[in-house]
A protein has these predicted regions:
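Long, terminal "pre-/pro-" and other extracytoplasmic accessory regions
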Residues: 2-12, 19-170
Length: 170
C-alpha cells in the first residue's frame, strides 16, 4: 500500500514539471522566425508580406507569404528542421490586390534587409520568440507589426520598413 501511495505522490509532484516541460519544449526545439524566413527565401526570392508560426497537424510550421513581381507565394517551413515543406503561388488577382495594397507589395520588396536586421536584433535578446510579422500601412508609413513573446510576456512592436527603427505598438 505504501508503494502505491509513494508512486501516486511522486506522480502528482512530477506532473506539473512534465506539463511545464511540454509547454516550453516547442520553443527550445524550433528555429527562429528569421531562420524560417531565410529558408523560405532560399526557395522563393521575395520580400516578406506576412509570417507566422502555426500548428499544422501535430507539427509547428511557419507560414510565410512572400511577394516577387506580380505573384504572392505562401511557403510553409517546418519549425523544427527549417525545411521547406510546400509552396504555392497566387497571381495578384483583383481579390489579392484588395488584400495587399500596392504600397505594401512595393515595401515588401525593398524592406528585406531592414526586416532581417531588426528581427535578428530582437531574437538576440534573451528568451525572445517572434510569433508573427505582418506588413501594414500605419500613419502613412510602412511598418512590420511584430508579435513576440519574451521574458516579460507577450508584446507587440513595430519595425519601420524603411529605417528599421523598432518602437512599441501603442
Amino acid at each position: 500500500m505504501t508503494h502505491k501511495f509513494t508512486a501516486l505522490a511522486t506522480s502528482l509532484l512530477l506532473a506539473p514539471a512534465a506539463l511545464f516541460a511540454q509547454e516550453t519544449a516547442p520553443e527550445a526545439e524550433r528555429i527562429s522566425m528569421s531562420q524560417a524566413i531565410k529558408s523560405a527565401q532560399s526557395s522563393i526570392d521575395g520580400g516578406v508580406l506576412e509570417a507566422e508560426i502555426e500548428t499544422e497537424g501535430d507539427a509547428l510550421v511557419y507560414e510565410i507569404d512572400l511577394v516577387r513581381g506580380e505573384s504572392v507565394y505562401e511557403v510553409t517551413v517546418n519549425a523544427a528542421t527549417g525545411d521547406v515543406m510546400k509552396q504555392s503561388e497566387e497571381q495578384l488577382t483583383s481579390f489579392l490586390s484588395g488584400l495587399f495594397q500596392e504600397d505594401e507589395l512595393r515595401a515588401a520588396g525593398t524592406a528585406r534587409d531592414v526586416l532581417m536586421t531588426a528581427l535578428t536584433e530582437l531574437e538576440g535578446q534573451d528568451s525572445t520568440w517572434i510569433e508573427e510579422v505582418s506588413l501594414d500601412d500605419e500613419d502613412d508609413r510602412m511598418v512590420y507589426e511584430v508579435e513576440l513573446t519574451d521574458a516579460t510576456g507577450e508584446r507587440e512592436l513595430l519595425i519601420d520598413a524603411t529605417t528599421g527603427e523598432i518602437t512599441p505598438d501603442d
